[in-house]
Regions:
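Generic detection of short hydrophobic beta-strand segments and adjacent strand-loop junctions
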Residues: 3-11, 138-148, 212-214
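Surface-exposed helix-capping loop/turn segments at secondary-structure junctions
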Residues: 39-43, 88-95, 277-281, 324-328
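Acidic carboxylate diad motif detector
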Residues: 51-168, 303, 307
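Gly/serine-rich nucleotide phosphate-binding loop at the start of the catalytic core
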Residues: 1-74, 96
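Short amphipathic alpha-helical coiled-coil/interface segments
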Residues: 24-27, 75-83, 249-257
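An alpha-helix initiation/capping motif
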Residues: 48, 69-73, 77, 265, ...
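Stable alpha-helical structural segments in soluble proteins, enriched in small hydrophobic residues
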Residues: 30, 34, 74-86, 380-395
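Positively charged, helix-rich recognition surfaces that bind polyanionic ligands
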Residues: 3, 169-415
């Protein structure tokens, strides 16, 4: 399987940065040339101009000659792919399977813009990535060398993408590399249920009664700080009558997104490592249809709602589970927080078309505390995670019913 590593390109000299920026601009020019040829051919003939025909037209182009041939061909292939999607949708329209109003021809990139450089043939020299040049470009420009991340040493790199950000004020580099799937022989009779929340990002409970919480208050803090500073910047913008997003706002958003991405990656790794260390072969994750939740954090400056990207956490878990041979299941989680696990309440599925009221044996008596019909107290999120595990029907829960209690959950703070 393939994994992707993202980094910001740093430690370039001024000449190297200018060269990279120029290459990205040339790539944009070639992209627009390729788009122009296909569009004009379609307008005249109502047919599709194939990749091979477009290549024959452009191989002597000035922009094509300035780029390394592999890099130039990757650009033509990407343009070809976008138009194939367009013509595929046209076929669906003819068959009455798609709305004609939603289809648009691929547009040109901005004249002064930049686009992604795709490197399909990776050349390394002393653990440095050497950006491939054409013979023509090499005569007049100094080579660009980017240090390879230590984690990729010895790995087979399939593709590298260099993506201009904020009108090429900086570049992001994405390495796609191959890893072997380590299929561990884990016990499929052991399962871990996960209930997603806000203060407790992940509440994890096993069918043997062990439990732990991954703290989510740090994510709230990151979002809260972002909203506070962004509100100040927005106020300054409004006074100066600036309509577009400012560079300071973009930097602030990028920092916030990077911190959240890092936090979720570490949280997913903690969960999967726990399964590997405790011979747990199945993970069941509770989910909502939109996989987003809103929370009122009781503050001002447009901070009433915080969006946490649970979908990213889900995808990271799926990826890691596939890598190590842990079976992963998404489980619809309606009423799992209201039903009582130890009372064996039936857990219905919420129907938007026909919503109904249900009565359950237990109830939440305090924030974070659930009481069963016989007065036993249990962590409310643990009760939800257990019901997610029960609703999935993937593991036997008789041990828990016989015990009638859980271990006290341990809170894990991600650093």
């Amino acid at each position: 399987m393939y994994l992707t590593l993202k980094q910001q390109v740093k430690h370039l000299s001024k000449k190297e940065f200018r060269n990279l920026k120029y290459l990205s601009h040339i790539a944009k020019n070639l992209t627009n040339e390729a788009i122009y040829n296909i569009r004009q051919y379609y307008f005249k003939n109502k047919k599709y101009l194939s990749y091979n025909e477009n290549y024959k037209i452009l191989k002597n182009s000035e922009n094509y000659k300035k780029l390394n041939s592999n890099m130039a061909q990757q650009i033509l292939k990407e343009v070809d792919g976008s138009f194939k999607s367009f013509f595929g949708l046209l076929k669906l329209v003819k068959n009455g399977q798609y709305d004609n109003k939603k289809i648009k021809l691929p547009k040109y990139l901005a004249k002064d813009g930049f686009t992604t450089l795709v490197i399909g043939f990776v050349r390394l020299k002393d653990d440095m990535l050497i950006i491939p040049y054409s013979n023509l470009f090499r005569k007049t420009h100094k080579e660009i060398a980017i240090k390879l991340p230590p984690v990729l040493k010895g790995k087979k790199i399939k593709e590298i993408r260099i993506i201009p950000k904020q009108h090429s004020r900086y570049f992001e580099i994405q390495y796609t590399y191959e890893v072997k799937e380590v299929q561990r022989e884990l016990n499929k009779e052991n399962g871990l249920g996960i209930d997603l929340g806000i203060d407790n990002l992940c509440t994890c409970v096993t069918n043997n009664g062990a439990s732990f919480l991954i703290d989510g208050r740090k994510l709230k803090s990151i979002n809260r700080y972002y909203n506070k500073i962004n509100a100040k910047l927005q106020s300054i913008k409004d006074k100066q009558k600036i309509e577009n997003t400012t560079l300071r706002q973009k930097r602030l958003a990028r920092k916030r997104n990077n911190r959240i991405e890092d936090y979720l990656s570490k949280a997913a790794r903690i969960i999967v490592n726990y399964c590997l260390n405790n011979d747990i072969g199945r993970i069941v994750l509770g989910y909502n249809e939109d996989f987003q939740r809103n929370s009122n954090i009781g503050s001002i400056n447009n901070q009433n709602f915080v969006n946490i990207p649970y979908g990213k956490l889900r995808d990271k878990l799926i990826h890691l589970c596939k890598l190590y041979g842990v079976e992963f299941k998404l489980q619809e989680e309606s009423y799992t927080s209201k039903a009582s696990f130890f009372d064996g309440d039936e857990i219905p599925i919420y129907d938007k078309e026909n919503p109904q009221e249900y009565i359950f044996s237990g109830k939440r008596i305090k924030r974070g505390l659930y009481q069963t019909s016989v007065g036993k107290l249990i962590n409310a999120d643990c009760n939800g995670a257990l019901n997610i595990l029960r609703k999935s029907k993937v593991v036997d829960l008789s041990i828990l019913y016989n015990r009638g209690e859980l271990n006290t959950p341990k809170r894990i703070r991600v650093v």
